[in-house]
Amino acid sequence: MTAELQAASGGPGGLEADCQVLNKMKEITGIQDADFLHAALKAAKGNLMEALIVLTEERDQEPVQNTAAAEPSSWEGSAVGKEPPQGGAAFDPEKKGDVHSAVAYGQLESPKAHAAERPQEVHSPEHKNRSKRKRCEVWGENSKQSDWKRVGDWPVGMKNIGNTCWFSAVIQSLFQLPQFRRLVLSYSFPPNVLESCRTRTGKRNIAFMQELQCLFALMLGTRRKFVDPSAALELLRDAFKSTEEQQQDVSEFTHKLLDWLEDAFQLAVNVRSPGDKSENPMVQLFYGTFLTEGVHEGNTFSKIETFGQYPLQVNGYRNLNECLEGAMVEGEMDEETATQSVKYVQERWFTKLPPVLTFELSRFEFNQSLGQPEKIHTKLEFPQTIFMDRYLYCSKELIQTKREEMKKLKEKMLVLQQKLERYMKYGSGPARFPLPDMLQYVLEFITTKPAGAVSSACVSSTEDSQMMDRQSQGESLILGTPSQPDSMLDGKDGKPEDEAVLLANSSPQQQLNAPLQPSEPPAEMSDCPAPHVVSEEEMNLVTTCLQRWRNEIEQDVRDLKESIARVSLSIDEMYSDPHLQQVPYHLHAVLVHEGQANAGHYWAFIYDQPRKSWLKYNDISVTESSWEELERDSFGGLRNASAYCLMYISDKVSHVVAGEGDGSEVGQFQKEVEALPPELRRYIQEDNWRLEQEAEEWEEEQSCKIPSTASESQELSPESGLDPPAAHEQSLRSLSSEHAMIAKEQTAKAIANAANVYEKNGVEAALCEAFHEEYSRLYLLSKETPTPQNDARLQHVLVYFLQNDAPQQIVERTLLEQFADKNLSYDERSISIMKVARDKLKEIGPDEVNMEEYKKWHEDYSLFRKVSVYLLTGLELYQNRKYKESLTYLIYAYQSNTTLLKKGANRGVNESLITLYRRKCLLKLNEVASSLFVSCEEAHVAEGISILNELIIPCMHLINNFDISREDMDAIEVMRNRWCSYLGREDMDASLQIRLGELLPRLLDGSTEVVVLKEPPKIRPNSPYDLCSRFAAVMESIHDASTVTVK
């Protein structure tokens, strides 16, 4: 951790290793193993900061081990992992998964649950400091109609009524199933059924179905951007109230919801066929059966059971097929018959699969020692299409045969890997290395000449051997064999202290190579090691033997790798038999949980058949997504977000949904609305009428604010020196015209320089001369070597285009448009040249210049200028210690700059400069907020909380949304640690402890919120020269005043 971060930490020296501290360490690091955390704290001698540093280094290895889940950040890509310091040598991250055994379901976030997890926290009923994350609150006094009005046929979101994001995820996934949607909307029963239903449960189920009908009707026909599910939720909540008012888990809520629907449909079914559940449409859609066969104490048994949501364990499995295989086969092999068929205690086979197949992933377990649930964050992959043939009873004989084949292949794979490991980890001592490389090193030693020989050959030879060593290690890693000896991981090499520190801060690959790398030799010993005396005959004999042995061993290694590859391919293709691909199920929805067991957020990814794309349903927000984003958020292993429920639909259901998607979705929804009963249609109409009333009232309120808003917009017009009367005119011009106006002084100078040509040869010759002279000037300017104090792109749009290799037609049209700008009406010469330039612009046809591409280039330059202005303003404010204002500018500069850098390195500004000062500003602001909070003065405390809620936490979440760097991650951990250090302080008032307990869940949960950070006021530079002079002044000030170098 850098000195800068250490200076910002400000925490106490140590805390007791009690249950509260372990809970805090779990939330900060994401590690759930209490024994592992306790060992870390003990090794750090009770120092919480040292323990967190070690744990953070251990945790940083995980993204590299699971690179398939997400793209690595810039600091992750260069190393396989980090070796722990000597103080933490006893920790083994691989042992984390062994602790998890029993799996329980995760609970919803609640004050009671927080109290169980953090005994020191006291929760007030009002939650004044937003201890609960209300992600739906993106509207407010200054919201626009677009924030709450539906756009076209886009699906609607669902309002979060206080920790009800799980309900939105479940209901949205069910609503997007046409069969289920129609079942709910067409639900009806004779009036006498309601009269004869006297039980409270029956009446409640009917009431819930009626509320769900109204909700689904609104989701079809509303003009709102999101709907309010309060009525249906109240019925659910009332059903779970008990004398102890305990919080129920999400899975139980979901099961109860489906049970109520089933019971409601059964009331209607009983009118025709009393007691016949097979006619229940919910059973037909969501329920299947499986056969359990096995042997218990020597006796065989067989039974058929019904299932709805099928539970699957996650721990110990890599993908969904492995989970299913583990669930279908339980028991151990009979060793006496190992050479014969494989015997299992119990096997399950699906005898009937439902059209909608739901898998419930058990990602929660109950920790008996802590007395609270914990979440399992391990990675689990699942496919978009899964073939269920291998789990069907009709495939039993074929699958049992393949399981025997699979067992033999895995045994063969194990033998081959063990053989290969003997080659790749050769030696009898604690440090072992690849045998081919060891022979190569000996060969290099033999052939090295004594002192006085050319040293470059020695260096070259050493580099070549290191390269081969890296390649060998990389291959062994790919094949799943360890590439590090245990002694290296334990740090027991007996090296000097400074070398041990170097090893602790290097990657395992670098540590493996460390003994083979030549250290910097002293001046008097500049030669490589070499034999003292060796005859030509001895050298030839040893060289011949070493080369022959090395070739033999390399051939053995290649043969082993080829055999492993063949066996691995056979394993991968074991179930690729066409006979086992007749029952496909397609992924319909993925329900995701983010956070810990007792606190978190839920959302859903649902495949939209009409649009042929994935949509993300996150409370009121419904946005277009991708399979790549779904993988990152759902597979787990990297962050604390992972799927907890998968919903697959059969091929038949998928075809029905796809068939409906052939036409317009809005047309399909309209047809369903027209088919609704009259009372539901009237309900939709009334809600839409209320929306129009609300819109009219909103417009009346906004009309009172128009004068002040207009004057404000004129005062802060972007990027130009226009007077207020010209603001409206500027908004109507294209960006290219705006850029021409910005450069009008330079264009006017070019016209003035062509005055002689104008007098001698006329207007066209003057335009041609001025055009070529200006082009030559800008071209040379674009080729100048940039300096930290000078960015030529700020001077002119064409410099930006030329440095980014814009098409020549776009460059020429842009420059011609500069001379056609009507703002050049200074004199007769300028007006004449302007008219000729305009005529030439009209002659350029659409085939010569792609106007869409032309527009995009000018949009990029406009965004570049905006980023530059925001960056300069942020840096100036930072130097003036106005950290609140500075941070907002820097955050917006980074977000816009990221968009530009995706198109090319020269499209945006120096990203490292923005991230450095954004980080420094955030740390300074956190220091200010925390100091205000502990001041015990109410006004200062309120201000500190306001800074934390409105700036620091939103900015932390925005940083997490991008590829976060190691420095940013360390900074976030430092800020969290500072606030955690205030827990349990005796000198802090009890009311402050309550407020702190309410703030910490949002601060510690690194999940992505729907963050709406108000954009800062726009700043207008008077001219390009003004912008360049400000840039030079700020950069000169930074480099003179700061010792931090920007890489």
UniProtKB/Swiss-Prot annotation:
GO CC aspect terms: cytosol; nucleoplasm; nucleus
EC nos: 3.4.19.12
Bias (Polar residues) ranges: 461-486, 504-516, 705-717
Basic and acidic residues compositional bias, start-end: 111-128, 489-498
An example molecular function term from Gene Ontology annotations: cysteine-type deubiquitinase activity
Transmembrane segment boundaries: none
Catalytic activity: Thiol-dependent hydrolysis of ester, thioester, amide, peptide and isopeptide bonds formed by the C-terminal Gly of ubiquitin (a 76-residue protein attached to proteins as an intracellular targeting signal)
Domain of life from the UniProt record: Eukaryota
Subcellular location, principal: nucleus
Entry keywords, A to Z: DNA damage, DNA repair, Hydrolase, Nucleus, Protease, Thiol protease, Ubl conjugation pathway
Span list, region Disordered: 60-95, 110-138, 461-528, 694-735
UniProt entry tagged with the keyword Iron: no
Top-rank EC class of the record's enzyme: hydrolase
Domain UIM: 94-113
Stretches assigned to the USP domain: 156-651
Subcellular location: Nucleus, Nucleoplasm
InterPro entries linked to this entry: Papain-like_cys_pep_sf, Peptidase_C19_UCH, UBA-like_sf, UBP14-like, USP25/28_UIM, USP_CS, USP_dom
One of the GO biological process terms: cell population proliferation
UniProt cross-references to CDD domains, sorted A to Z: Peptidase_C19I, UBA_UBP28, USP28_C
The keyword Acetylation is annotated on this UniProt entry: no
Active-site residues (renumbered): 165 (nucleophile), 601 (proton acceptor)
Function: Deubiquitinase involved in DNA damage response checkpoint and MYC proto-oncogene stability. Involved in DNA damage induced apoptosis by specifically deubiquitinating proteins of the DNA damage pathway such as CLSPN. Also involved in G2 DNA damage checkpoint, by deubiquitinating CLSPN, and preventing its degradation by the anaphase promoting complex/cyclosome (APC/C). Specifically deubiquitinates MYC in the nucleoplasm, leading to prevent MYC degradation by the proteasome.
UniProt similarity note: Belongs to the peptidase C19 family. USP28 subfamily.
Protein name: Ubiquitin carboxyl-terminal hydrolase 28
Primary gene name: USP28
